[in-house]
Amino acid sequence: DKQVHFEVLSNPEFLAEGTAISDLESPDRVLIGGHETESGQVALQTLVDIYASWIPRERILTSNVWSAELSKLTANAFLAQRVSSINAISQLCEATEANVAEVAHAIGTDSRIGSKFLKASVGFGGSCFKKDILNLAYLCETYGLHEAAAYWQQVVDMNEFQQNRFVKTILSSMFNTIAGKRIAVLGFAFKADTGDTRESPAISVCKELASEQAQVVISDPKALDNAEKDLADATGIMFEEDPYEAVVDAHALAILTEWDVYKTLDYQRIFDAMEKPAFLFDGRNILDHTALHKIGFEVYSIGKGRLTHLD
């Protein structure tokens, strides 16, 4: 039989859910890694030529295989690192008189830093960030780079801490018990414009709320089917597509996904339907907190402290 020779290339994708088609049609860059051999470079150039039919050549980057593989992991690790970094600062902002949004804007105007992924929140999710960071940490451990592994592990640890901290804020704000109280959760997808719930912060938040014997009512425009699967083993959880129905007789409302529809809800109507005092916990900092406080809400946000009528 005639022998078959082939080359293995690395061509990591950098697509984001919700913008995958546009990311493919007009990517920031395409990265192709090939072996540094004659046949490896021929194979690499073949794939370059395919991409060059619709992508400008200057956006097509080439490297060796290891560089391409690590670039994928490092890209997601750096993005997640920014989220965990600003979330770490959000805790300090709450302890002082700082506003994390103002801090993020101030540092984001520095051209060396930029403004993307500097929005404090309940945490990052999705199928890639945690997986890729843990992969990076594992590689570091494999090569005996323990300090580097611990550094990247801390990005994940900080994210999980932020989710737990959000639940503790709810508990402490509501007089240290939520047993028997109805808590409406708006948003379950890990981010807006997708029904994907993989590694969504809402999973751990809702499970912790339920473990405190709260009655949790979850609403989301696209993710309810996945939410039911993710929380199949949890008790005390209900699902309601209509956000206005979800908040009826609720003692608290928590925003966990930055859906645009939540920015335009009638919050006077929501306040009127809730038990009093009506608590609102904005885990994505997407609402007008001053306006909500004027309506009558007890407002708690990430990195901004609280606006309350109870003091």
Segment roles from a protein language model:
Residues 1-311:
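Structural/interface elements that position substrates and couple domains in central-metabolism enzymes
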